[in-house]
UniProtKB/Swiss-Prot annotation:
The gene is gpi18. Glycans are attached at N108, N139, N326. The chain crosses the membrane at residues 71-91, 167-187, 220-240, 261-281, 290-309, 357-377, 389-409, 441-461. Part of the GPI mannosyltransferase 2 complex composed of gpi18 and C167.09. Keywords: Endoplasmic reticulum, Glycoprotein, Glycosyltransferase, GPI-anchor biosynthesis, Membrane, Transferase, Transmembrane, Transmembrane helix. InterPro entries: PIG-V/Gpi18. The lineage of its organism: Eukaryota, Fungi, Dikarya, Ascomycota, Taphrinomycotina. It comes from Schizosaccharomyces pombe (strain 972 / ATCC 24843). This is GPI mannosyltransferase 2. Mannosyltransferase involved in glycosylphosphatidylinositol-anchor biosynthesis. Responsible for the transfer of the second mannose to the glycosylphosphatidylinositol during GPI precursor assembly.
Length: 464
C-alpha cells in the first residue's frame, strides 16, 4: 500500500482512471455499433418490405391487366354479336329482297310461328344456307345438292332441339348454338394466342380482329363457320401443347363440319416431309424416323377418314344412277359443287362476278399481307409452326381465288389464325408507321363491312 504522494500511488490512480475511461469508451462504441446494426436491420427490413410490396403490386397489376384485356375480349364478342343480329332484325322489317324464309315457314307448320317474337327471329336470321340446314335437320339429306353441306351440323341442331320437327325452334336453336360455338372459338383463339406470344395486348387485338372479321354475322347465325372455327382453334391449342392425337381428332370433327378441314393435315404433312428430307440427305432411314412417319400418317388418316367416309355414303346412295359415278374419282362433294354451283378452275372469272371479287378483297389483301409479313423479319417469322400456317393460308388463298365462289373466302378464312396474328402484330408492333396504319385501316374497313353485311343478310341480299 502506498501513501499519498508516493510515485507508485499516482501511477496506480492514473491506471485506474484510464481503465474506467476505456470502459466507458468501449460501452459507448458498443452502443453506437448496436444502433448502427439496428439501423441496418431496419433498412434491410424496409427494403425487403418494399420489394414484397412491389412484387405484390406487380402481381396485382398483372392480374388487373389480365382481367382488363380479358374484359375487352368479352365485350368485343358481345358487342359484335348483338350488333350484327340486331341489324339483321331491323333490316328484315325495312327491306326484304327475297321471301324464301317466309315461304318456307308457310310450307312447314310451327307452333312457335304463332309468336311474333319467334317468327321475327326466324325470318330475320334464317337465310341462304341456314334454310338448307334447318330442312336437313327436319328431313335429312334427301336431295343430291344437300350433300355439299355438313351432315353433322343438322344432327347437332336436331339433338339440341330434342328431336323436334318445329322449323322455327330448329332455326332459333341453330343460331344460339352458333353463338355458343363462336364464344368457344373466341376463347380458344384467346388461349392459343396467349400460349404462343405471352402478350395480353397482342391476344386482345387478335380476338378483336377475329370478332370483326369479314365472316361477320355468319358466325352468329345457323351456319357452320363458328363450329368449324371452334374445332380448328381447339385442335391448334392441343397441337402446340404436343397433344397431337387429340388435335387430330378435333380436326377430324372439323372435317365433318366443313370439307376444308382436311387441310389441317398440313400440320402433320410438313414435319413428315422434313423427316423424309433428312433421311434422303443422310441416305438412311432409322427406326425412329419410320415410327415418326407412321405416326404422322396415322394422324393424317384420322383427319381424312370422315371426309372419305361421307363420300362413300354418297356413292352408295346415288350410284350408279348419276353421271359423276363414272369418274375416275367418284366423289359426291366436288360433283355437286360443279353441277349446282358451277364450281371449278377459273369458272368464276366472269365479268358479272367482278363485284364478288371486290367483296373478296376484304380477305385476299389481308391474307397476302399476312403471308409477306410473316415471311419478313417480324416476330411471327420465328414461330415454330409458321411454315404450316403459311402453307395453309396460301392454299386457302389459291382455292378461294381460282376454284370457288371467291366471296366465300370471307367466311372460309375465319379459321385462319395467322391472318389475325399478323394484323394484330402489325397494328401494335410494326416498325413502320405505314404498316401500323394499314392494320388500323383494315380493322376499320372490316367493322364497316360487317355492319353493312349484317344489313344485307337481314334483307336476303348477297354476298352470301
Amino acid at each position: 500500500m502506498y501513501y499519498i504522494g508516493h510515485p507508485s500511488y499516482y501511477r496506480k490512480h492514473i491506471e485506474h482512471v484510464c481503465f474506467q475511461h476505456s470502459g466507458i469508451l468501449k460501452k459507448r462504441n458498443y452502443q453506437k455499433n448496436q444502433k448502427k446494426y439496428i439501423m441496418k436491420l431496419n433498412e434491410s427490413a424496409m427494403k425487403n418490405a418494399e420489394k414484397k410490396s412491389n412484387s405484390y403490386l406487380a402481381i396485382r397489376m398483372t392480374r388487373s391487366g389480365y382481367n382488363y384485356f380479358k374484359g375487352i375480349c368479352v365485350c368485343t364478342f358481345l358487342l359484335s354479336t348483338i350488333l350484327y343480329l340486331g341489324i339483321a332484325v331491323i333490316m328484315s322489317h325495312l327491306c326484304v329482297f327475297d321471301d324464301t324464309a317466309m315461304l318456307y315457314l308457310r310450307q312447314n307448320r310451327s307452333r312457335l310461328a304463332e309468336s311474333n317474337i319467334f317468327r321475327t327471329l326466324f325470318i330475320s336470321w334464317i337465310r341462304w344456307d341456314a334454310i338448307y340446314f334447318v330442312d336437313m335437320a327436319v328431313n335429312g339429306s334427301l336431295f343430291e345438292q344437300e350433300w355439299a353441306f355438313s351432315s353433322l351440323w343438322p344432327k347437332i341442331i336436331s339433338f339440341l332441339a330434342f328431336r323436334s320437327k318445329d322449323v322455327v325452334l330448329l332455326g332459333i336453336v341453330s343460331c344460339f348454338a352458333s353463338i355458343f360455338f363462336h364464344a368457344i372459338a373466341c376463347y380458344a383463339l384467346y388461349l392459343l394466342t396467349k400460349s404462343i406470344f405471352s402478350n395480353q395486348k397482342m391476344t386482345a387485338y387478335t380476338v378483336i380482329f377475329y370478332c370483326f372479321s369479314p365472316s361477320g354475322i355468319y358466325m352468329s347465325v345457323g351456319y357452320t363457320e363458328s363450329l368449324f372455327a371452334a374445332f380448328s382453334f381447339l385442335g391448334l391449342l392441343l397441337f402446340i401443347k404436343k397433344q397431337q392425337y387429340p388435335a387430330a381428332f378435333l380436326w377430324s370433327l372439323a372435317t365433318l363440319i366443313r370439307s376444308n378441314g382436311i387441310f389441317w393435315c398440313i400440320f402433320f404433312g410438313m414435319p413428315a416431309i422434313g423427316t423424309l428430307k433428312i433421311s434422303l440427305e443422310r441416305l438412311q432411314l432409322t427406326f425412329m424416323q419410320v415410327s415418326q412417319l407412321v405416326g404422322y400418317g396415322t394422324k393424317c388418316l384420322i383427319i381424312l377418314v370422315p371426309f372419305f367416309y361421307n363420300q362413300y355414303l354418297g356413292f352408295k346412295l346415288f350410284c350408279p344412277g348419276v353421271a359423276w359415278c363414272n369418274k375416275s374419282l367418284p366423289l359426291i362433294y366436288p360433283a355437286v359443287q360443279e353441277k349446282y354451283w358451277n364450281v371449278g378452275f377459273l369458272r368464276y372469272w366472269t365479268l358479272n362476278n367482278i363485284p364478288n371479287f371486290l367483296f373478296a378483297l376484304l380477305s385476299i389483301i389481308p391474307i397476302l399481307f399476312a403471308l409477306f409479313y410473316s415471311i419478313s423479319g417480324s416476330t411471327l417469322h420465328s414461330f415454330r409452326s409458321i411454315k404450316s400456317h403459311l402453307v395453309l393460308s396460301a392454299l386457302y388463298l389459291y382455292i378461294g381465288c381460282f376454284h370457288m365462289h371467291t366471296q366465300v373466302l370471307n367466311r372460309m378464312s375465319s379459321a385462319l389464325p395467322l391472318l389475325y396474328w399478323s394484323m394484330a402484330h402489325a397494328t401494335l408492333y410494326a416498325k413502320s408507321r405505314n404498316l401500323k396504319a394499314f392494320g388500323h385501316c383494315i380493322l376499320f374497313v372490316w367493322i364497316v363491312y360487317t355492319v353493312i353485311q349484317a344489313g344485307l343478310y337481314g334483307s336476303f341480299l348477297p354476298p352470301a
